[in-house]
């Protein structure tokens, strides 16, 4: 059976594929002091979903901690690596990148992304009150 990329059919570009293709891998943990380690293990298990880059962000109740890098999970998130020691928190989410498009600078495309919002001169921080 022909596969499509999920886009509307187009007469200009028939999108028929021979089989399944992999897409990015996402893994998260909530409520564990080892959230970053468990997330790195989960991303390692999902490495086939993206081999170009990986990133993890954690939350310790007051601050976010993130690390992103080109390459495989095992090369960047070893159990005793400085990066893992900095990823403190009980909540973590990670991403393996499988690019289908992107920037000339591949580092700019590694998730997770972060941003801040300012409105009317005030910075907004989203936390529980």
List the model feature ranges, each with a label.
Residues 1-129:
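N-terminal glutamine amidotransferase
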């Amino acid at each position: 059976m022909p596969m499509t990329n999920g886009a509307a059919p187009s007469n200009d570009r028939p999108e028929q594929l021979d089989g399944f293709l992999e897409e990015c891998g996402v893994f998260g943990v909530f409520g564990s002091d080892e959230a970053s380690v468990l997330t790195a293990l989960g991303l390692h298990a999902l490495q086939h979903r993206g081999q170009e880059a990986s990133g993890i962000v954690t939350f310790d109740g007051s601050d976010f901690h993130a690390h992103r890098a080109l390459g495989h999970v095992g090369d960047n998130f070893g159990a005793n690596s400085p990066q893992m020691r900095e990823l403190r928190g009980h909540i973590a989410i990670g991403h393996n990148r499988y690019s289908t498009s992107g920037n000339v600078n591949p580092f700019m495309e590694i998730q997770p992304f972060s941003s801040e919002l300012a409105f009317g001169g005030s910075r907004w921080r989203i936390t529980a009150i």
